[in-house]
């Protein structure tokens, strides 16, 4: 018998077709806050009502945020039990960690259960797990906890991503694509779960960028199943993952920073994050879509991480995008706030649901090609090229 070559083994290991998103699930805590009422609540619960000028500033931030409501695990009762979390910079990491190490995997499980149900295959067919959170750290990690909570096989191959921030919804899809395409038959469960218990704190007029975070961030978890060569009798691809890239923007050092301290996760923001992103976004688009021969940015569908309304406004203006291009993105920002890594997966879910309800020809608003952008600390940008799937009538 002839010896098997390494090349033959490698060929057998690889999938034939591209990776695709096969199912999506999302989850939020039950508790939510409306943006209109939030300034009064926030300044009351943090015992900061004497800071009247700062409260007015915060009200203006909330008014301009384009957010209607946000979901939050932290209820008034939890905050009353943990007064140090309500202070501006009081030691509180233990209390925060105690919450997130339990709640982050739990919320992730809710989203994963929905994705697995839609996928339609037994969970024993999940070969890989990617878990991503910027909310706390622990060993063994959320990936291990979720494996136990879901009852996945102990041999599932796990990846744990901590402290990546808002670009990571793109990162997880890039990793899942590589795993699915290089491991024949692989089915990758991807989970992003974020809870603001690590960043919530009272206001200070010396740290206005922290206040921006208090006005924007919300809690949520999203899960997707990614695989290549779908079993068409059961699996229904939603979006193909065609290519994926990551880059650090020039002259952007320190634009967005987060530091884990005794006081929790602190958040620092340079004012011109929207300018840095909008100035460089066309370069990323040209690199991604040049090989496909696309240069009209209104001819593709858009999934952009909604870091805040200013980023979306400036990207729209810089590229001359029609208003409807960022509709799904703005919809998610309005109804959930900025959920860090989970946002782009929520937007994928929103878009495919809108397309089905409106009778569109494809999952990409009737278009074939689309882009998914993640923006976050670094400044780091993730660019994923998507191919939509026809919606069967």
Swiss-Prot record:
InterPro entries: Chalcone/stilbene_synt_C, Chalcone/stilbene_synt_N, Chalcone/stilbene_synthase_AS, Polyketide_synthase_type-III, Thiolase-like. Pathway: Secondary metabolite biosynthesis; flavonoid biosynthesis. It catalyses: (E)-4-coumaroyl-CoA + 3 malonyl-CoA + 3 H(+) = 2',4,4',6'-tetrahydroxychalcone + 3 CO2 + 4 CoA. It comes from Ruta graveolens (Common rue). Keywords: Acyltransferase, Flavonoid biosynthesis, Transferase. The active site is at 166. The gene is CHS1. This is Chalcone synthase 1. Signal peptide: none annotated. PROSITE patterns: CHALCONE_SYNTH (PS00441).
